[in-house]
């Protein structure tokens, strides 16, 4: 369904806050969000991770992250993400712009030290390139899931809200 509000309207809300100027994370869910928490990374630009619990009907935790552009800061942020993910008891979906300019090897530590899997990346023949939005040639955006999440479909949506195209998954929670 087409979104009714232009991107320029949203950007005007953040122009006076330097760290939010033209940067934002968003989480949209058809299910009620019952818990929300914000984690601010200690390294790099003060970007945050949104942690939200939804019930569909089983509780799952969604994490939305936007990692740093600099490789050194990004590596430290990945270490922080490992701690955040491992502290969660529910099934987890971690998604966001990981800025992995040097390839998937950059998130290897995250995958090895948590229970998360790159279900989309397992389908190597059809990786979802999302950046730049006007001619996608890079995979910087990821959706990682715990083993109790079964991804049935994924797609790149043709909405030009930023320099990246959004990813969408359809999933079930295994019992």
Each model region followed by its residue ranges:
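Alpha-helical elements of Rossmann-like donor-binding domains used by nucleotide-donor carbohydrate transfer enzymes
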Residues: 51, 76-81, 105, 109
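A long, amphipathic alpha-helix that forms part
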Residues: 74-90
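Surface-exposed cleft-lining segments at the edges of enzyme active sites
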Residues: 37-40, 64-72
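Solvent-exposed loop/turn segments connecting transmembrane beta-strands
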Residues: 42-46, 70-74, 159-163
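Structured beta-strand-rich core segments of catalytic domains in phosphoester-bond hydrolases
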Residues: 1-59, 157-158
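Conserved hydrophobic/aromatic beta-strand scaffold that supports enzyme active sites
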Residues: 25-27, 49-53, 64, 142-143, ...
């Amino acid at each position: 369904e087409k979104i009714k509000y232009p991107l320029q309207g949203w950007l005007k809300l953040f122009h006076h806050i330097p760290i939010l100027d033209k940067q934002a994370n968003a989480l949209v869910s058809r299910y009620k969000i019952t818990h929300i928490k914000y984690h601010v990374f200690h390294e790099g630009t003060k970007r945050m991770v949104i942690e939200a619990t939804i019930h569909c009907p089983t509780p799952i935790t969604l994490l939305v992250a936007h990692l740093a552009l600099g490789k050194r800061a990004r590596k430290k942020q990945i270490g922080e993400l490992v701690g955040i993910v491992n502290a969660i008891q529910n099934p987890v979906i971690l998604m966001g712009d990981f800025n992995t300019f040097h390839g998937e090897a950059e998130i290897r530590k995250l995958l090895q030290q948590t229970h998360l899997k790159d279900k989309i990346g397992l389908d190597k023949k059809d990786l979802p390139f999302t950046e730049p939005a006007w001619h996608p040639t890079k995979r910087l955006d990821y959706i990682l899931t715990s083993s109790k999440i079964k991804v049935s479909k994924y797609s790149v949506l043709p909405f030009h809200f930023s320099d990246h195209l959004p990813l969408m998954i359809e999933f079930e929670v295994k019992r």
